[in-house]
Regions:
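Anion-binding and metal-coordination hotspots
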Residues: 1-258
Length: 258
């Protein structure tokens, strides 16, 4: 592997030198040539660290700290996200927070450049909605990854209903049995998982074909806007149909000829 890497790096350096000295013989503009040169230099600069990382994992069998890992030669703003899902214990990328209202409109979103814990995401989200945008929030529903005493206390101080799914099975059973509306709220929240899938795969595209955190953040913003326009259009169409059906019901039947 190391011998192959040295050969490939040698070819890259040769092409780099040729492009720098003989660019005038090509049909590339100065800007296009600099773009290619920058890409080659970027990869060559990371090769020693990439080889060391591969040696540690493949030959030495040793783990590499996340902060020292090269996840992509072309984008250094990705993170290792532990998911614990079957067949995908970890994922690579940026954590995305989405919050929707009961109509399915995304009212809050944030793409994180770092990798905060799930339980720490609720408080800043409530602050953005209530304090910054002056939106009245009566109740919130989240999965058990956000449940915790700190978040429960935060919601209680703000007078917001706590619909977080408890991590403890006994607490969950108690809420399902004794708290009015809790079961229905969790069922509605389950639909958010489908919303996330639609958002990622339809509106955001998967994989997201942009590099760099700022470009990904911008793409998410445009996707949220497009998604919400789509939802509003469907709501308007549904309301129009409801009114037409209502008018049809109250309209007197046509008289038939004897």
């Amino acid at each position: 592997m190391k011998a192959l890497e040295k050969r490939i790096a040698g070819h890259a350096r040769a092409h780099l030198t040729a492009l720098k000295t003989r660019r005038h013989e090509t049909d590339l503009s100065e800007a296009q040539a600099q773009q290619i040169i920058g890409r080659i230099v970027n990869v060559l600069g990371q090769l020693p660290a990439a080889v060391k990382q591969a040696h540690e994992r493949m030959i030495g069998g040793r783990n590499v700290a996340n902060k020292d890992k090269i996840l992509s030669l072309y984008d250094d703003s990705l993170n290792v996200i532990v998911r614990g899902k079957a067949g995908a214990n970890v994922e690579f990328g940026n954590k995305l927070w989405l919050g929707e209202n009961s109509d399915g409109i995304i009212v809050d979103y944030k793409l994180y450049q770092d990798n905060p814990s799930d339980s720490s995401l609720a408080k800043p989200a409530i602050k953005r909605l209530v304090d910054d945008r002056k939106i009245e929030v009566k109740q919130v529903w989240c999965d058990r990854g956000l449940a915790g005493k700190l978040n429960t206390a935060m919601l209680e101080r703000r007078g917001i209903g706590d619909g977080f799914c408890p991590r403890d099975v006994a607490d969950l059973s108690d809420k399902l049995a004794n708290e009015p509306g809790f079961r229905e709220g969790l069922k509605r929240r389950a639909g958010t998982e489908a919303r996330i899938g639609i958002f990622k795969n339809v509106f955001l595209s998967r994989p997201l074909l942009v590099r760099g955190f700022e470009h990904r953040e911008l793409a998410v913003g445009w996707a949220v806007l497009t998604h919400n326009l789509w939802v509003v259009a469907h709501m308007a169409e549904a309301e129009k149909k409801r009114k037409e059906d209502q008018e049809q019901k109250v309209r007197p039947p046509k008289a038939r000829a004897a």
